[in-house]
């Protein structure tokens, strides 16, 4: 289940936008603290891109 909480990020076009990720997951090596990654869709170009999510974002 995807949690749709909007976060403020920078799009590949260089603009700041407040978007909700379509998918979110944790990326971590064995035995280490990982980072949270979100899959976003650029509203201007329609292309998908990945961006780091805040640590307090529920996955």
Swiss-Prot record:
- Domain of life, per UniProt, equals Archaea
Identify the Pfam families for this entry.
Cren7 (PF11520)
How does it get modified after it is made?
A: Methylated at multiple sites, to varying extents.
The record's Gene Ontology cellular component field reads: chromosome; cytoplasm
Q: Does the keyword rRNA-binding apply?
A: no
Q: Where in the cell is it found?
A: Chromosome; Cytoplasm
Query: Can the keyword rRNA-binding be found in this entry's annotation?
Result: no
A GO molecular-function descriptor? double-stranded DNA binding
| Main subcellular location | cytoplasm
Q: What InterPro entries has UniProt attached to this entry?
A: Cren7_sf (IPR038647), dsDNA-bd_Cren7 (IPR020906)
Kindly state which keywords UniProt assigns to this record, in alphabetical order.
Chromosome, Cytoplasm, DNA-binding, Methylation
The family line of this record is: Belongs to the Cren7 family.
Quaternary structure per UniProt?
Answer: Monomer.
| Role played | A chromatin protein, binds double-stranded DNA without sequence specificity. Constrains negative DNA supercoils.
Protein name listed in UniProt: Chromatin protein Cren7
Q: What is the lineage of its organism?
A: Archaea, Thermoproteota, Thermoprotei, Sulfolobales, Sulfolobaceae
């Amino acid at each position: 289940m995807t949690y749709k909480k909007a976060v403020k990020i920078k799009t590949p076009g260089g603009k700041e936008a407040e978007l909700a990720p379509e998918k979110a997951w944790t990326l971590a090596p064995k035995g280490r603290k990982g980072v949270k990654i979100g899959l976003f869709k650029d509203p201007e170009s329609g292309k998908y891109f990945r961006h780091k999510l805040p640590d307090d974002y529920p996955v």
